[in-house]
């Protein structure tokens, strides 16, 4: 057992030496982390931004807001009952079917 402990220690030392030798990038990274500790944090923005994002859906412009508002109204209002028996579109009007226009009381300035 005493022989295993030095081997484990030497293996750890070898890993540390390899890390130091093979990765100067890690050394530079450690220097930068020491100099700028706040840059290592996860991105998330300010507290204000996080709070605004947690609030929920926000609208891009007034059109989006009005469309969402109209959808909510359509869901809340029940469908209108067909009380009227009037049918639209069963007769196509012709010029003879239309009533005559009444002449205007005010003379047109274009007529002269």
UniProtKB/Swiss-Prot annotation:
One GO cellular component term noted in the UniProt record for this chain: cytoplasm
Residue spans of biased composition, Basic and acidic residues class: 12-32
Function (record text): Protein phosphatase inhibitor that specifically inhibits protein phosphatase 2A (PP2A) during mitosis. Inhibition of PP2A is enhanced when ARPP19 is phosphorylated. When phosphorylated at Ser-62 during mitosis, specifically interacts with PPP2R2D (PR55-delta) and inhibits its activity, leading to inactivation of PP2A, an essential condition to keep cyclin-B1-CDK1 activity high during M phase. May indirectly enhance GAP43 expression by binding to the NGF-regulatory region of its mRNA.
Family indicated by similarity: Belongs to the endosulfine family.
Modifications after synthesis and translation: Phosphorylation at Ser-62 by MASTL/GWL during mitosis is essential for interaction with PPP2R2D (PR55-delta) and subsequent inactivation of PP2A. Phosphorylated by PKA.
Record keyword Cell division present: yes
Region (Disordered): 1-49, 74-112
Modified residues (Phosphoserine): 2, 23, 62, 104
Annotated positions of the N6-acetyllysine modification: 109
GO biological process: cell division; G2/M transition of mitotic cell cycle; mitotic cell cycle; positive regulation of gluconeogenesis; positive regulation of Ras protein signal transduction
Primary subcellular site in the record, as a coarse category: cytoplasm
UniProt name for this protein: cAMP-regulated phosphoprotein 19
Cross-referenced Pfam families: Endosulfine
Listed Low complexity bias regions: 1-11
Induction notes from the record: Up-regulated in denervated skeletal muscle (at protein level).
Subcellular location per the Swiss-Prot or TrEMBL entry: Cytoplasm
Tissue expr: Whereas isoform ARPP-19 is ubiquitously expressed, isoform ARPP-16 is found only in selected brain neurons.
Keywords assigned by UniProt, alphabetized: Acetylation, Cell cycle, Cell division, Cytoplasm, Mitosis, Phosphoprotein, Protein phosphatase inhibitor
Keyword Ribosomal protein part of the UniProt annotation: no
Disulphide bonds in the chain: none
């Amino acid at each position: 057992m005493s022989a295993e402990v030095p081997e484990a220690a030497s293996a750890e030392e070898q890993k540390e030496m390899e890390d130091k030798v093979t990765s100067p990038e890690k050394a530079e990274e450690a220097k930068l982390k020491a100099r700028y500790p706040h840059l290592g944090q996860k991105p998330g923005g300010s507290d204000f931004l996080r709070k605004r994002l947690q609030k929920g859906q926000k609208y891009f412009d007034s059109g989006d807001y009005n469309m969402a508002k109209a959808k909510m109204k359509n869901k809340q209002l029940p469908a209108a009952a067909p009380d009227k028996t009037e049918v639209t579109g069963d007769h196509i009007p012709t010029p003879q079917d239309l009533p005559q226009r009444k002449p205007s009381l005010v003379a047109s300035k274009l007529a002269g």
